[in-house]
């Protein structure tokens, strides 16, 4: 099979698209499907992994929660360490081989987890998953490669919607498979990842031309070196800081949403699940359909700030809502937070060259990993501090209000950083 006039090899280059006035729609579609399938394979195991850990521990729920938390921390740590490496590798060898090998690695890793005879093997599989999942940063670099700068906000919005679609579908499919056998979702995730690798091998073209590639150097590939890129431009550092605060604020949802909704409103797992699914669907609609027209109407800078302020308002509604109805009314407001991420990505990709896009996305992913390490402890401890008997002020919504503060600070930093852009 020939793509762009050449054979479908692991490192086949395509003509760089930034000289054209329109993004390479086919290439964007390919990478968006890849993102959906990646997130689908990731989300499939969510409903069953804690239960499988508990089974290995003989039903000890408390110890299982501790081990599961360590698994999550290990996954985030691997993201922090390995995302810059994969980003630098993609700058050197191209995006295509990194994406395909990561998908292949994920597929084999899920098979390992499906066959895991002990908790140690399951833990090792989770660590490997964190390494292989670092290809998400390469997907962001691919989008930057194949999309002209003035189209990137919409393209990153579609990428965010693809993340959301895969993440909404994944747990639902995993729950159905897990009802039959707790190991079936791992086989489903393996099949999805391996099929994705096959799909990409035949249809995914390379996006980074040979002449725009950069040598691989460890000073670029290690987290500290990758983060130094963010300090190379004042605007870039400010935007990266705002993006970090966005990711940190988002950590309140997986950390305390279930605890908060159960504590304050008496909701069970099904009600919480439907609510979180509604949040994901609304955000997906905004990122998939509204980023382009809103950006065209408001401009890129105002779209970014509007998204951050909507997120801050949504979290404030969540934290102060006296009734479940008021809480649910915050969901559509929160959905417009989805404007901020694509806009921030668009601004940041404009500040670096084509040969640095992988390094940039790796640095962003490393910051996301740091947020993933900090968030669970920060928000659960805040929640405990404001509902415990020692609390001077009983405020269950304190974690959400903390996220509101983080986004307001992020909005101020982003406004200042984009003044000269």
Regions found by a protein language model. Name each.
Residues 301-344:
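C-terminal transmembrane helical hairpin of 12-TM major facilitator-type secondary transporters
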């Amino acid at each position: 099979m020939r793509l762009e006039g050449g054979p479908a090899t692991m490192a086949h280059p395509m003509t760089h698209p930034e000289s054209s006035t329109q993004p390479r729609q086919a290439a964007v579609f390919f990478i968006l499907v890849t993102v959906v399938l990646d997130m689908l394979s990731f989300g499939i195991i969510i409903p069953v992994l804690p239960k499988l850990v508990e089974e290995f521990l003989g039903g000890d729920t408390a110890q299982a929660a501790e081990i599961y938390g360590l698994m999550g921390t290990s996954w985030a740590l691997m993201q922090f360490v390995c995302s810059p490496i994969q980003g630098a590798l993609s700058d050197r060898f191209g995006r295509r081989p990194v994406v395909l090998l990561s998908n292949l690695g994920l597929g084999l890793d899920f098979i390992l987890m499906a066959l895991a005879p002990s908790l140690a093997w399951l833990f090792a599989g989770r660590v490997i998953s964190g390494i292989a999942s670092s290809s998400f940063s390469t997907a962001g670099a691919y989008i930057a490669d194949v999309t002209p700068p003035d189209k990137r906000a919409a393209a990153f919005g579609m990428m965010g919607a693809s993340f959301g679609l895969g993440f909404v579908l994944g747990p639902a499919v995993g729950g159905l498979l897990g009802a039959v056998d707790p190991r079936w979702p791992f086989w489903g995730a393996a099949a999805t990842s391996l099929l994705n690798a096959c799909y990409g091998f035949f249809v995914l073209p390379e996006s980074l031309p040979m002449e725009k590639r950069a040598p691989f150097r460890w000073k670029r590939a290690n987290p500290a070196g990758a983060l130094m890129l963010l300090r190379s431009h004042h605007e870039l550092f400010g935007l990266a800081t705002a993006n970090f605060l966005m990711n940190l604020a988002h950590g309140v949802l997986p950390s305390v949403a279930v605890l908060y909704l159960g504590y304050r409103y008496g909701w069970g797992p099904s009600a919480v699940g439907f609510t979180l699914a509604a949040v994901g669907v609304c955000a997906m609609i905004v990122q998939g359909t509204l980023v382009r027209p809103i950006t065209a109407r408001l401009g890129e800078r105002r779209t970014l700030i509007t998204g951050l302020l909507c997120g801050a308002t949504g979290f404030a509604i969540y934290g102060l809502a006296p009734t479940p109805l008021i809480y649910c009314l915050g969901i559509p407001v929160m959905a417009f937070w989805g404007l901020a991420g694509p806009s921030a990505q668009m601004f940041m990709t404009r500040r670096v060259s084509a040969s640095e896009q992988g390094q940039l996305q790796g640095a962003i992913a490393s910051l996301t990993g740091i947020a993933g390490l900090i968030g669970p402890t920060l928000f659960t401890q805040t929640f405990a501090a404001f509902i415990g008997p020692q609390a001077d002020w009983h405020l269950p919504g304190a974690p959400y209000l903390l996220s509101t503060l983080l986004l307001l600070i992020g909005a101020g930093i982003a406004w200042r950083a984009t003044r000269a852009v």
